[in-house]
Design a protein with these regions (language model features):
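Acidic, polar ligand-binding/catalytic clefts
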Residues: 7, 18-82
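Hydrophobic residues within well-ordered alpha-helices
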Residues: 9, 33-35, 85, 125-126, ...
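Alpha-to-beta junction loops
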Residues: 15-17, 35-45, 88-89, 127-139, ...
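A ligand-binding cleft/hinge motif common to bilobed small-molecule-binding domains
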Residues: 29, 45-53, 103-104, 131-163
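Bilobed "Venus flytrap"/periplasmic-binding protein-like clamshell domains
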Residues: 1-13, 45-47, 63-122, 137-142, ...
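Ligand-binding clefts/hinges and TM-proximal coupling segments of bilobed small-molecule sensing domains
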Residues: 97-113, 152-154, 183-211
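Periplasmic-binding protein-like
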Residues: 63-70, 145-186, 204-211
């Protein structure tokens, strides 16, 4: 999904697919203050006021919810309410809005486990060191389909008091192209392209909202 959005934004800016160059960055490295090795970055970054102090964001390209992932037969596999997660050992990657969602929405009785990245959290889940992990919904579908044998999406967490999250393209602070990139994203939203890409690459079936 992110790659499709990147190519669509590039096209809006006058670049064809051959003109797009991909570079690897870590999640934390890309969001740290300082110069960047990219023009814009898509790693499912939620737009937050705290992050906007050190980087720029485009307007939002996807309205995102957080989801709880586990394995079949786990203590929370059949949960249908947030209350049923209160006593679970949940985990998330450091610095993510997923970790914030555990604390603010679930408010578990035991402190959330914090991992360097989603890969480490998945390993902990496979080893049954945690009952479940919280990630954004697109990642939840990927993990349960590809990474976690007998993986299960317990459900989506309800919206937090601070409102719905949005993913945005991340740019260097005060980047000269932030306005142009935002204009491209806005155009893709207005002409329906973003909705079409979400329908093509993402789905919400099988991920009910926990009450």
């Amino acid at each position: 999904f992110e790659a499709a959005v990147a190519y669509a934004v590039a096209e809006q800016l006058g670049f064809d697919a051959a003109g797009v160059t991909w570079v690897r960055t870590t999640f934390d490295g890309a969001i740290a203050p300082g110069p960047k090795t990219f023009d814009f970055n898509l790693q499912q970054y939620s737009i937050t006021e705290e992050r906007q102090k050190v980087v720029d964001f485009s307007s939002g390209y996807y309205d995102v919810t957080q989801a709880v992932v586990t394995y079949a037969g786990s203590p929370i596999a059949e949960a249908t309410t947030v209350a049923e997660l209160k006593d679970a050992k949940l985990g998330a990657a450091v610095g993510t809005t997923s970790l914030k969602a555990i604390d603010e929405i679930v408010q578990p009785s035991q402190k959330a486990a914090v991992f360097n990245d989603n890969a480490a959290a998945v390993t902990a889940l496979k080893n049954k060191q945690i009952d479940g992990l919280v990630v954004d919904l697109p990642t939840a579908f990927y993990l349960t389909a590809v990474e976690i044998e007998n993986g299960v999406i317990v459900g989506q967490l309800p919206e937090s008091a601070s409102g719905a999250e949005q993913f945005g393209l991340l740019l260097a602070k005060d980047s000269p192209i932030t306005e142009c990139v935002t204009g491209a994203v806005d155009a893709l939203r207005e002409d329906g392209t973003l909705d079409e890409l979400a329908d093509e690459w993402l789905a919400s079936a099988g991920a009910p909202v926990l009450t």
